[in-house]
A protein has these predicted regions:
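Hydrophobic transmembrane helix segments
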Residues: 5-44
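Loop-to-transmembrane helix junctions at the membrane interface
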Residues: 53-80
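Juxtamembrane loop-transmembrane helix junctions in multi-pass integral membrane proteins
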Residues: 3-7, 55-62, 87-101
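Interfacial non-cytosolic loop connecting adjacent transmembrane helices
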Residues: 31-37, 75-104
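Aromatic-anchored segments of alpha-helical transmembrane domains
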Residues: 16-26, 70-82
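Short, highly charged, low-complexity non-transmembrane loops/tails of multi-pass membrane proteins
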Residues: 125-140
């Protein structure tokens, strides 16, 4: 039996959804005045969905790279940097246990997608390397 290198689109869809839901949970608790149609929800959801479609229908490699960048941006920028009161931020984040916990939820929700994408990109890269070497012309 051959080991498959392809990631099932249902797993990818589930982890993209989980990634977005991490942000939704954060925003519902921390920014309850926002409507579900506000850009903080709808724009990020559309970006996530659009990048998933690129991965699924257009290019696994480029879609995976773009999705990985988006998930890392959410993890580093959204879950980590934006909770620390840096002077360069245009806002002062609340320094409370609840706020920290919401950022932990937001960050942890990114990890399954990041792990899946790194695994998928590595397997595809290894698979492409095998294809390239198998097409070489033997030396005479």
């Amino acid at each position: 039996m051959r080991k498959s290198t392809a990631v099932d689109f249902r797993w990818m869809a589930a982890f993209v959804l989980l990634s977005w839901l991490g942000e939704v949970i954060h925003n519902r608790i921390e920014l309850p005045q926002l409507s579900l149609l506000s850009p903080e929800y709808s724009a990020t959801g559309l970006i996530s969905f659009g990048l998933f479609l690129v991965w699924w229908k257009v290019s696994k490699r480029w879609g995976g790279i773009l999705l990985l960048g988006w998930a890392l941006l959410n993890l580093i920028g959204g879950a980590i940097v934006s909770v620390i009161p840096f002077s360069f931020l245009p806002f002062y984040p609340e320094q409370s246990l609840q706020h920290y916990l919401m950022h932990v939820v937001y960050g942890v929700a990114q990890i399954p997608l990041i792990v899946l994408l790194i695994r998928d990109l590595r397997l595809r890269s290894a698979s492409d390397g095998l294809k390239e070497t198998s097409h070489e012309t033997p030396a005479l």
